[in-house]
A protein has these predicted regions:
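Conserved catalytic core of the tyrosine transesterase superfamily
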Residues: 1-246
Length: 246
C-alpha cells in the first residue's frame, strides 16, 4: 500500500516540478518549493492531497520546533503552490502561519575590512570576483552570472540580468573595477564569462563553458572571513549592501 501511495505521490511531485519550471521561478525557489513537498510527503506518509486544517496545524507546529521561520514560510508557499497548480484547488488558509515580524540590518563590510579580505584571498579569480561584487554592490549570484556582453564600458555601467524578482537592472561601473576586470580578462580571455570556471586550472579557463562554482566561492569567502577574524553573520552576502569603492 505504501509503495502505491509513494508512486502516486512521485507522479504528482513531478507535475509540481514541471509547473515550477513553467512559471519561470528562480532555481533556488524551485528547490525550496520542491523540498517542501518532499518533506510534507514523508511526514504524511505520501498523502498530502486532502490535508485538513488540523493536520496542517500539527505539521507546521512541528516544523517551527525544528526549523527556522524561513523554512516554515517556504514550506507554506511550496504547499500553496502545489495546492493551486497541481491539485487545482483554491488556497483557503491565508492565516495558517504568521511568522514574527523582524527587521534586521545586513552586515556591512567597510572599505578597510574589504581591503583585508582582498589581500587575504590568494586565488586571483576569487580576489577579482570579491572586489567586483563589493565595488558594485552585487549579490553573489548576480556576480557569477556576469558575461562580457553585460559590460558597457562606454557608459560605465553593467547590466545585471535576472536579478532579484527576475528583473534586469543597470548598475554603475566604477573606473577602478573596469580596470581590474580588463586586466583579469587579459589573463583568462574567455569569450563568454566574466568569471569562468576554475575547473581544469587557469589553462582551461579560456574554454570554460560555466562560470565559477557558487559553492567554491562561498567556501573561500567564509574561510577568508574567518582568517581575517571579521565577525560577520552572513559572509556570502555581506558585499551586496556595501558602499561602492569609487
Amino acid at each position: 500500500m505504501t509503495t502505491t501511495r509513494q508512486a502516486e505521490f512521485d507522479q504528482r511531485y513531478q507535475t509540481h516540478l514541471k509547473h515550477l519550471k513553467l512559471k519561470g521561478l528562480q532555481p533556488k525557489t524551485i528547490e525550496a518549493y520542491s523540498r517542501a513537498i518532499r518533506r510534507m510527503g514523508e511526514y504524511f506518509d505520501w498523502q498530502i492531497d486532502a490535508l485538513s486544517s488540523s493536520q496542517l496545524t500539527d505539521y507546521f507546529s512541528d516544523l517551527v520546533a525544528t526549523h527556522s521561520w524561513s523554512s516554515v514560510k517556504l514550506d507554506l508557499y511550496g504547499y500553496k503552490f502545489y495546492t493551486q497548480h497541481v491539485l487545482r484547488k483554491p488556497w483557503g488558509m491565508p492565516d495558517l502561519v504568521k511568522p514574527p515580524k523582524t527587521q534586521r540590518l545586513p552586515d556591512i563590510v567597510t572599505v578597510e575590512e574589504a581591503a583585508r579580505l582582498f589581500a587575504a584571498t590568494r586565488c586571483l579569480s576569487y580576489r577579482v570576483f570579491f572586489f567586483t561584487i563589493y565595488s558594485m554592490g552585487l549579490r553573489l549570484g548576480e556576480g557569477l552570472a556576469l558575461r562580457l556582453g553585460d559590460i558597457d564600458a562606454a557608459r560605465a555601467r553593467v547590466q545585471v540580468r535576472d536579478a532579484k524578482g527576475n528583473r534586469d537592472r543597470l548598475v554603475p561601473l566604477p573606473a577602478p573595477t573596469l580596470s581590474v576586470l580588463r586586466r583579469f580578462w587579459q589573463i583568462h580571455r574567455n569569450a563568454q564569462w566574466l568569471f569562468p570556471s576554475r575547473q581544469g586550472g587557469a589553462a582551461a579557463a579560456r574554454e570554460a563553458r560555466l562560470p565559477l562554482d557558487r559553492g567554491g566561492v562561498q567556501t573561500t569567502l567564509r574561510r577568508v572571513v574567518q582568517d581575517c577574524r571579521l565577525k560577520k553573520t552572513s559572509p556570502p552576502t555581506v558585499f551586496a549592501t556595501a558602499m561602492q569603492l569609487t
